[in-house]
Design a protein with these regions (language model features):
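Short active-site neighborhood of thiol/selenol oxidoreductases, capturing the structured segment around
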Residues: 64-94
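Thiol-/selenol-based redox modules, centered on thioredoxin-like
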Residues: 167-225
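N-terminal targeting signals for export/organelle localization
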Residues: 1-53, 225
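Short, internal strand/loop/helix patches
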Residues: 130-189
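Short loop/turn microsegments at loop-to-beta-strand junctions
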Residues: 51-52, 74, 189-191
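Structural microenvironment flanking redox-active thiols in thiol-disulfide oxidoreductases
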Residues: 91-155
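Hydrophobic beta-strand positions
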Residues: 55-56, 194
Length: 225
């Protein structure tokens, strides 16, 4: 009788272990290896870099500095509102990631912060920037400031930007120098910069941007941090 009981108990324990392992495999957050991330254009720094103090403004007019990065994973894109292609595309991808997270793990969603830093401050007012950034997600922030203040941040995260006159404007026969001076675009790095919850530059994601890659990268980093 005791042998039968022992056998039944062992079977029960075995089945329980199998069930637990199955449940864990189902609910385990998918993660990417460093090699997988690199193959998808995601580059994580061997040692995250501290970011020195800087001061910009968010679209509500509030000060935005290093402390605003702390406590969350920030995925930051540098662009401008009238950018015709890469900016709206990349921000739309970040918006998709945010919605996916919102429909899943609430804690993961809360720790995700999408930010657009406008490097076109001459044209992008805070109100315009706010309307643009929040169109992709009401939780997103638009941030900007004078060029010298922007450079204090961009140089620390390997982002470059420059005002470039439009070739079409330069060939126009016009005496309207004011209009000519205003005819420009802004060339800028297309990476999405990753800032970790300590406010350190953690890595970057190269173009083209993909929602699934960004979501899996975020889940991986958050789980390992």
């Amino acid at each position: 009788m005791s042998t039968i009981k022992s056998t039944v108990l062992l079977c029960f324990v075995f089945i329980s272990i199998v069930l637990v392992m199955f449940v864990i495999s189902v609910i385990r957050v998918p993660q990417l290896s460093v090699e997988e991330m690199r193959s998808k254009g995601v580059f994580i720094l061997p040692r995250p870099r501290d970011i020195a103090e800087f001061e910009l403004r968010d679209h509500t007019g509030a000060s935005f500095d290093r402390a605003n990065f702390e406590g969350r994973w920030s995925f930051v894109f540098f662009g401008f509102v009238s950018c015709p292609d890469v900016c709206p595309t990349s921000m739309a991808v970040l918006g998709t990631v945010d919605r996916q997270l919102q429909s899943g793990d609430s804690e993961l969603a809360e720790q995700f912060q999408g930010i657009l830093v406008s490097v076109g401050r001459d044209r992008d007012s805070l109100a315009t920037l706010g309307a643009y950034a929040t169109a992709f997600s009401p939780r997103f922030l638009g941030v900007t400031g004078p060029r010298e203040d922007l450079v204090e941040l961009t140089t620390q995260v390997n982002v470059a930007f420059a005002k470039v006159p439009l070739a079409e404007a330069l060939t126009q026969r016009t005496q309207n120098t004011e209009a000519l001076a205003d005819a420009y675009t802004v060339d800028h790095t297309g990476n999405i910069v990753i800032i970790n919850p300590r406010g350190h530059y953690h890595g970057f994601i190269k173009l083209p941007h993909d929602a699934e890659t960004i979501r899996l990268t975020y889940q991986t980093l958050a789980a390992q941090f």
